[in-house]
Amino acid sequence: MGLEKSLILFPLFVLLLGWVQPSLGKESSAQKFERQHMDSSGSSNNSPTYCNQMMKSRSMTKESCKPVNTFVHEPLEDVQAICSQENVTCKNGNRNCYKSSSALHITDCHLKGNSKYPNCNYNTNQYQKHIIVACDGNPYVPVHLDATV
């Protein structure tokens, strides 16, 4: 009797695992935004190697060198609050973008012209600028950094 039950339950278990497994470990758009753009711990401290270190540690140089990226040095809650601020049109024409009401501390990383994968080298520049983020989901949170202004 126990073997019959196992033979019936095992295929169901395999079917269930095949259905659930694809969602396991998949990064959400909000998680990707946090990984690629949030560095609440502080600023780049004028370190010329900040972008090289951060781009590598945040997995943006694994298969190629991401050409441009911006890190935001503000609390996550403050950046999430932008989703309830001034609604603006996104670069792609969508209407789910929002502009920060104040300038934020950011670091721009630009790939140096002579840099080639796997040796990704970046210029590091600090600014205080407004950011524009695309928001989505429930809760409504940033999923894309659209621009800095």
UniProtKB/Swiss-Prot annotation:
Function of the molecule: Endonuclease that catalyzes the cleavage of RNA on the 3' side of pyrimidine nucleotides. Acts on single-stranded and double-stranded RNA.
InterPro entries attached to this UniProt entry: RNaseA, RNaseA-like_dom_sf, RNaseA_AS, RNaseA_domain
Expressing tissues: Pancreas.
Name of the protein described by the UniProt record: Ribonuclease pancreatic
Main location (coarse class): secreted
Protein origin, superkingdom: Eukaryota
UniProt-recorded Gene Ontology molecular function terms: lyase activity; nucleic acid binding; ribonuclease A activity
Quaternary structure and interacting proteins, as annotated: Monomer. Interacts with and forms tight 1:1 complexes with RNH1. Dimerization of two such complexes may occur. Interaction with RNH1 inhibits this protein.
Known catalytic reactions: an [RNA] containing cytidine + H2O = an [RNA]-3'-cytidine-3'-phosphate + a 5'-hydroxy-ribonucleotide-3'-[RNA]; an [RNA] containing uridine + H2O = an [RNA]-3'-uridine-3'-phosphate + a 5'-hydroxy-ribonucleotide-3'-[RNA]
Gene Ontology biological process terms from the UniProt entry: defense response to Gram-positive bacterium
PANTHER family: RIBONUCLEASE, RIBONUCLEASE PANCREATIC
Name of the top EC class for this enzyme: lyase
Secretion signal, residue range per the UniProt entry: 1-25
Lineage, uppermost ranks: Eukaryota, Metazoa, Chordata, Craniata, Vertebrata
Binding site for substrate: K32, R35, K66, P67, V68, N69, T70, K91
Positions of disulphide bridges: C51-C109, C65-C120, C83-C135, C90-C97
Biased composition annotated in UniProt, kind: Polar residues: 39-49
Source organism of the structure: Mus pahari
Entry keyword annotation includes RNA-binding: no
UniProt keyword list: Disulfide bond, Endonuclease, Glycoprotein, Hydrolase, Lyase, Nuclease, Secreted, Signal
Residues glycosylated per entry: N87
Similarity-based family: Belongs to the pancreatic ribonuclease family.
Cellular component, GO, one term: extracellular region
